[in-house]
Amino acid sequence: MPGLKRILTVTILALWLPHPGNAQQQCTNGFDLDRQTGQCLDIDECRTIPEACRGDMMCVNQNGGYLCIPRTNPVYRGPYSNPYSTSYSGPYPAAAPPVPASNYPTISRPLVCRFGYQMDEGNQCVDVDECATDSHQCNPTQICINTEGGYTCSCTDGYWLLEGQCLDIDECRYGYCQQLCANVPGSYSCTCNPGFTLNDDGRSCQDVNECETENPCVQTCVNTYGSFICRCDPGYELEEDGIHCSDMDECSFSEFLCQHECVNQPGSYFCSCPPGYVLLEDNRSCQDINECEHRNHTCTPLQTCYNLQGGFKCIDPIVCEEPYLLIGDNRCMCPAENTGCRDQPFTILFRDMDVVSGRSVPADIFQMQATTRYPGAYYIFQIKSGNEGREFYMRQTGPISATLVMTRPIKGPRDIQLDLEMITVNTVINFRGSSVIRLRIYVSQYPF
């Protein structure tokens, strides 16, 4: 019996002592054996592995491993405990071979899988999908992500974990949208300002070329960033609605655009001249047409065509009144031997001239001068007749000359006849006589 007792003791000790070289195999990857307690402790890879997760990923330690997840999705660590925190440090070592004796007992024990695993039909430890079996402890606002030997409680995109709850992330605070952002639970929506359209990326905005898509302008459309402007053709101005164009009345801007008349037309204007004038190359000034030179008049062969500003005059032949006699084409003389000529001007000379309507005053318009200067004689110049309106006066400019001055602007058309008298006084021979210039002034209708 003492020999049998020794054999049983050795067999039992063989069952409980670890197999040489197999101590590290008691802990799987991700765990390390604590030699003092004999327990398998989790390895914190996030601390021991340099740059375990890179970029914008965050390292989260798990029992037996670690996860790299986006920083916007913090991991909720479930409340389950370390499977190796109990006194059991299995799996158990294989049983020692039985003592080769038919009457000695053989001791064996069943295989056990660690926490998070279960035995399949082939006696293999396989991972338990806690998410599929609904054996997790994730909050209803969270989602369960199965891992090897465990699970992770995480949040969907658009949420972040805070004190076990998934809270909505306000993406609008981080400038995800180029222009307008509207936060919604778990997501966000980007929109664009008027004049822009959302690109396919759902975030950036692109200018809309309204001139190509709508062309709202009546005349010319110019696209701008986010909008457009309408422009009008020359001669038009933009209305208050910013779209329509209305004709610009250039003639109302200034009375000096045209010398005579400004005629407005859609988008432009033109200058016109009255009959008897032609428009010059500057398209604003009018020039008189000399009908007499162009033989574009209605005078008879006996009449003389006299050109005026804007017209012409047909002047009849000079007819001298008694007792005057015609000398030449434009002079009448009273014979000295005729007693009826004693108190009459010795000669009457006919002259014609024209002035424009409203001519600025004072204006020197005609000059009168004696042809001969006699010793001891002096000359007096005056307006004998036709100046009832006091529109003229004679200014003597020298001993034998004087100038007719117009003192008031005269509006045409109008014909004026003045008798300008030159009186000759000779004290040596006691002589006094006179000569007259009968000046016919034709005032035109227009001031040009």
UniProtKB/Swiss-Prot annotation:
<dbReference type="GO" id="GO:0033690">
    <property type="term" value="P:positive regulation of osteoblast proliferation"/>
</dbReference>
<dbReference type="GO" id="GO:0048251">
    <property type="term" value="P:elastic fiber assembly"/>
</dbReference>
<feature type="disulfide bond">
    <location>
        <begin position="320"/>
        <end position="332"/>
    </location>
</feature>
<dbReference type="InterPro" id="IPR000152">
    <property type="entry name" value="EGF-type_Asp/Asn_hydroxyl_site"/>
</dbReference>
<feature type="disulfide bond">
    <location>
        <begin position="138"/>
        <end position="153"/>
    </location>
</feature>
<dbReference type="InterPro" id="IPR000742">
    <property type="entry name" value="EGF-like_dom"/>
</dbReference>
<dbReference type="GO" id="GO:0001558">
    <property type="term" value="P:regulation of cell growth"/>
</dbReference>
<feature type="disulfide bond">
    <location>
        <begin position="172"/>
        <end position="181"/>
    </location>
</feature>
<dbReference type="GO" id="GO:0071953">
    <property type="term" value="C:elastic fiber"/>
</dbReference>
<keyword id="KW-1015">Disulfide bond</keyword>
<dbReference type="GO" id="GO:0045944">
    <property type="term" value="P:positive regulation of transcription by RNA polymerase II"/>
</dbReference>
<feature type="disulfide bond">
    <location>
        <begin position="232"/>
        <end position="245"/>
    </location>
</feature>
<dbReference type="Pfam" id="PF22914">
    <property type="entry name" value="Fibulin_C"/>
</dbReference>
<dbReference type="GO" id="GO:0007155">
    <property type="term" value="P:cell adhesion"/>
</dbReference>
<keyword id="KW-0964">Secreted</keyword>
<feature type="domain" description="EGF-like 1; calcium-binding">
    <location>
        <begin position="42"/>
        <end position="82"/>
    </location>
</feature>
<feature type="domain" description="EGF-like 2; calcium-binding">
    <location>
        <begin position="127"/>
        <end position="167"/>
    </location>
</feature>
<feature type="glycosylation site" description="N-linked (GlcNAc...) asparagine">
    <location>
        <position position="296"/>
    </location>
</feature>
<keyword id="KW-0325">Glycoprotein</keyword>
<dbReference type="GO" id="GO:0042803">
    <property type="term" value="F:protein homodimerization activity"/>
</dbReference>
<feature type="disulfide bond">
    <location>
        <begin position="299"/>
        <end position="314"/>
    </location>
</feature>
<dbReference type="InterPro" id="IPR049883">
    <property type="entry name" value="NOTCH1_EGF-like"/>
</dbReference>
<keyword id="KW-0130">Cell adhesion</keyword>
<dbReference type="GO" id="GO:0034394">
    <property type="term" value="P:protein localization to cell surface"/>
</dbReference>
<dbReference type="Pfam" id="PF12662">
    <property type="entry name" value="cEGF"/>
</dbReference>
<feature type="domain" description="EGF-like 4; calcium-binding">
    <location>
        <begin position="207"/>
        <end position="246"/>
    </location>
</feature>
<keyword id="KW-0106">Calcium</keyword>
<feature type="disulfide bond">
    <location>
        <begin position="46"/>
        <end position="59"/>
    </location>
</feature>
<dbReference type="GO" id="GO:0005178">
    <property type="term" value="F:integrin binding"/>
</dbReference>
<feature type="disulfide bond">
    <location>
        <begin position="211"/>
        <end position="221"/>
    </location>
</feature>
<feature type="disulfide bond">
    <location>
        <begin position="217"/>
        <end position="230"/>
    </location>
</feature>
<dbReference type="Pfam" id="PF07645">
    <property type="entry name" value="EGF_CA"/>
</dbReference>
<feature type="disulfide bond">
    <location>
        <begin position="177"/>
        <end position="190"/>
    </location>
</feature>
<comment type="subunit">
    <text>Homodimer. Monomer, homodimerizes in presence of Ca(2+). Interacts with ELN. Interacts (via N-terminus) with the integrins ITGAV/ITGB3, ITGAV/ITGB5 and ITGA9/ITGB1. Interacts with FBN1 (via N-terminal domain). Forms a ternary complex with ELN and FBN1. Interacts with EFEMP2 with moderate affinity. Interacts with LOXL1.</text>
</comment>
<comment type="similarity">
    <text>Belongs to the fibulin family.</text>
</comment>
<keyword id="KW-0272">Extracellular matrix</keyword>
<dbReference type="GO" id="GO:0046903">
    <property type="term" value="P:secretion"/>
</dbReference>
<feature type="domain" description="EGF-like 3; calcium-binding">
    <location>
        <begin position="168"/>
        <end position="206"/>
    </location>
</feature>
<dbReference type="InterPro" id="IPR001881">
    <property type="entry name" value="EGF-like_Ca-bd_dom"/>
</dbReference>
<dbReference type="GO" id="GO:0098867">
    <property type="term" value="P:intramembranous bone growth"/>
</dbReference>
<dbReference type="InterPro" id="IPR055088">
    <property type="entry name" value="Fibulin_C"/>
</dbReference>
<feature type="domain" description="EGF-like 6; calcium-binding">
    <location>
        <begin position="288"/>
        <end position="333"/>
    </location>
</feature>
